[in-house]
Amino acid sequence: MDNKAMYLHTVSDRDNGSIFEEPFDGRSLSKLNLCEDGPCHKRRAGGCCTQLGSLSALKHAVLGLYLLVFLILVGIFILAVSRPRSSPDDLKALTRNVNRLNESLRDMQLRLLQAPLQADLTEQVWKVQDALQNQTDSLLALAGLVQRLEGTLWGLHAQAAQTEQAMALLRDRTGQQSDSAQLELYQLQVESNRSQLLLQRHAGLLDGLARRVGVLGEELADVGGALRGLNHSLSYDVALHSTWLQDLQVLVSNASADTRRMRLVHMDMEMQLKQELATLNVVTEDLRLKDWEHSIALRNITLAKGPPGPKGDQGNEGKEGKPGSPGLPGSRGLPGERGDPGLPGPKGDDGKLGATGPMGMRGFKGDRGPKGEKGERGERAGDMDFTMIRLVNGSGPHQGRVEVFHDRRWGTVCDDGWDKKDGDVVCRMLGFHGVEEVYRTARFGQGTGRIWMDDVNCKGTESSIFHCQFSKWGVTNCGHAEDAGVTCTVP
């Protein structure tokens, strides 16, 4: 705002008429042209213009002053509306000055309108000049306040610009933190899915192990029952055999006593037999002598024989006699030692295939295989081209709308050509075994943002949906009403 200096004159300058020497140029309020016809530096004989023309010029000057004040107020209000608020003290001082200026101008206008035409016009002009001098001081003070207000507003504007820059930087950092948090949340979700699958697999293994332990417990119970029965039977057999052994010991002791007694009897009978044999030999000799004597007497005693010679040698053993009749059966003998095992018998026929047993425990990790051949060089990825995938708006982590993360933003997948092969790849990326059902036409609600993938065509063997054939990133002819979705299988 341009502040023009106002050159005002005091009451002592009335005589020289200096206030009428320069025309009123619309900028200086102190040098008023009270004539109606432009520059009036030529004074009339009466010392001034006519009263009617001077009054008209004064009214025009007051109206111009009113218009100037109005424009100043309009500018102040525009600045107040377009800029941030200033301090309350400056606004209160500015409001008081404007109100005082309005009241002074209103009083001046009323005095001018009510003043009689016959009054001394020169006195009225000097009074107006004094009033304008006072108003000029007020306007100068008001201009200073406006300048200070404008400086304060510019300072606030600079602070607001700095604040906007800081807010933009904060929004960028917040967006980066949000993207990082979303990526970490996705990774945690994938790890959670894998952990759930591992827990379910371990639960299945534990169930199988529990069943096997139960079957083994039943078998152990059967074996224990069989062992108890065998123990009972063996105890009975051992007791029976002990009884038999005791009886056998009694029989053996009796047999030993009988044997000793029979040996004594045999010895006695042997002595008797020896005595009988000796007696029999004597008798035999006597009989032989008697027989010889008789034979000599009966024959013609022509030859005389001498006495018998000594006893001859024992003759040859006679022929073996016939076997006698079998005797009575004796008691059962002790069991003999166990014989050698016999030869193995012929192989029997194959039996029927039994039921499949429970799944065994996981084996040890095998040896590392040979190093494979070097693959072809892949395409170079971008610095920020880190792609991920998630399921949104489903009843659980196993189902929902398919969204991929590309270029630091999440986007959806169009259902053009969407089938179970594509869904199977997506589910295996998320750690599930496979896909149960695929959906089209935004079954889980319409997404927002970009549609990153369209015309997806997977073979079903890919490890990632980004290895499948599809149109370029963000190139699509679909809307969010065609967002694809899946439901993965949960064991």
UniProtKB/Swiss-Prot annotation:
Tissue specificity statement from the Swiss-Prot or TrEMBL entry: Expressed in the testis, trachea, lung, bladder and small intestine; especially in epithelial cells associated with mucosal surfaces.
Coiled-coil intervals: 91-111
Localization per record: Cell membrane
Membrane disposition: Single-pass type II membrane protein
Glycosylated position list: 102, 134, 193, 231, 254, 300, 393
Transmembrane regions listed in the UniProt entry: 61-81
Disulfide bonds: 414-478, 427-488, 458-468
The keyword Membrane belongs to this UniProt entry's keyword annotation: yes
Protein's UniProt keywords contain Membrane: yes
Domain SRCR: 389-489
Gene Ontology CC: one annotated term: cell surface
Positions with biased composition (Basic and acidic residues): 364-380
Record-linked PROSITE patterns: SRCR_1, SRCR_2
Compositionally biased region (Low complexity): 323-334
Segments on the Cytoplasmic face: 1-60
GO terms, molecular function: ferritin receptor activity
Pfam families: Collagen (PF01391), SRCR (PF00530)
Extracellular side: 82-491
Region (Disordered) location: 301-380
Oligomeric form and interacting partners: Homotrimer.
Function field: Ferritin receptor that mediates non-transferrin-dependent delivery of iron. Mediates cellular uptake of ferritin-bound iron by stimulating ferritin endocytosis from the cell surface with consequent iron delivery within the cell. Delivery of iron to cells by ferritin is required for the development of specific cell types, suggesting the existence of cell type-specific mechanisms of iron traffic in organogenesis, which alternatively utilize transferrin or non-transferrin iron delivery pathways. Ferritin mediates iron uptake in capsule cells of the developing kidney.
Family statement: Belongs to the SCARA5 family.
Protein's UniProt name: Scavenger receptor class A member 5
Organism taxonomic ancestry: Eukaryota, Metazoa, Chordata, Craniata, Vertebrata
